[in-house]
Design a protein with these regions (language model features):
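N-terminal accessory nucleic-acid engagement/regulatory domains that precede
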Residues: 1-103
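P-loop NTPase Walker
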Residues: 103-183
Length: 183
C-alpha cells in the first residue's frame, strides 16, 4: 500500500488487464510491475514475457490462456470489466462488454497521443516485441499507430535489454516541434 502511494500514475490506472492461464495461475497486467513484501508479483509489467498472451492470444492460438480480462478504469475507480474466454467451460463466469479496443476508439481525441498500452493489438505487439537486431521498418498510412508502436517498442527494448542499452539513451526524431510535443 505504501509503494502504491509512491507511484506517480496521475489519472492512469495501474492495472488494465488480467490473464488466467490453464494451470490456474493468474497475472494482473499493468503499466509497471508491483510486488508484495515477499517480492511476489502482484502486477506484472506489460513488457514482461508473461504478459505477451494478453496481446497475442487468439481463438486459434490461445497461448495457454483460459481468459483474458480487460479493466476500464479512471484512476482508482473501476468502470468496466470485460472477458474474452478461450475455454468454453468458463462461459457462464465471464463479463461480456463491447470490446476494450472499440471503447478506446470511441473516445474523443484531444490533441494528445493516446496511451494504447491496454489496447495493443497482436500485430502491433509483434512489432513491439520483435528481437533486437538491426533496423526495423514499420510502414502504414496516417493514423495507423506507427508512432505509438515505435514508442512502445523503445520502452519494451529498454525494459528487456536494460543492461546492454543502459546509458545509450533513445533518440526520437520527428518532422517538427509540434509533432514532438504531440508525442
Amino acid at each position: 500500500q505504501n509503494r502504491l502511494g509512491q507511484l506517480q500514475l496521475g489519472s492512469a490506472s495501474l492495472i488494465f488487464g488480467r490473464v488466467d492461464l490453464d494451470n490456474d495461475v493468474r497475472f494482473y497486467i499493468g503499466r509497471l510491475a508491483v510486488s508484495d513484501e515477499r517480492q511476489e508479483p502482484v502486477v506484472v509489467d506489460w513488457r514482461a514475457p508473461v504478459a505477451e498472451p494478453f496481446y497475442r492470444a487468439t481463438g486459434r492460438d490461445p497461448m495457454g490462456l483460459i481468459r483474458r480480462r480487460h479493466f476500464v478504469s479512471r484512476g482508482r475507480e473501476l468502470l468496466e470489466i470485460e472477458d474474452e474466454l478461450f475455454d468454453l467451460d468458463q462461459l457462464d463466469e465471464g463479463f461480456q462488454g463491447h470490446g476494450a479496443l472499440l471503447a478506446a476508439l470511441d473516445q474523443n481525441r484531444d490533441g494528445q497521443l493516446r496511451d494504447i498500452v491496454a489496447t495493443i493489438q497482436g500485430e502491433q505487439d509483434e512489432i513491439i516485441r520483435d528481437p533486437l537486431k538491426g533496423m526495423l521498418i514499420v510502414q502504414g498510412g496516417p493514423g495507423t499507430g506507427k508512432t505509438v508502436v515505435a514508442l512502445h517498442r523503445a520502452a519494451y527494448l529498454l525494459y528487456t535489454h536494460r543492461f546492454p542499452l543502459e546509458g545509450q539513451g533513445v533518440l526520437v526524431v520527428g518532422p517538427n516541434r509540434l509533432f514532438l510535443r504531440y508525442i
